[in-house]
């Protein structure tokens, strides 16, 4: 299993708009519906007002690679350009 902790550092005051657009366009739901997806959830950190945390779990590397080719993933990259200044990705692999 592959786990990604993705921290989006948003432009000041833009985090809520970023998350609203993701959900309005169904990007989160589409990702959850992909083959091999186990978890795809957004969290709002209490301390960092402009950060948005995404926790993803994928069955294997093939599922994660396929995710990167989906139209909703491409759309997320376009949305990020408007709202996000930096993306930090932590990747973990487990034997599960």
For the regions a protein language model found, what residue spans apply to each?
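Short amphipathic alpha-helical segments
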Residues: 14-38, 72-76
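A beta-strand edge to alpha-helix "cap/lid" segment located at domain peripheries
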Residues: 23, 31, 66, 88-96
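Acidic-residue sensor for enzyme active/binding pockets
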Residues: 34, 56, 90
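Absolute protein N-terminus
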Residues: 1-2, 96
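Short, well-ordered beta-strand segments in beta-rich or mixed alpha/beta enzyme
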Residues: 2-9, 39-68
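Residue-level signal for well-ordered alpha-helical positions
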Residues: 21, 43, 67-70, 79
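Glycine-rich beta-strand-turn "strand-cap" elements at beta-sheet edges
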Residues: 39-50, 75-96
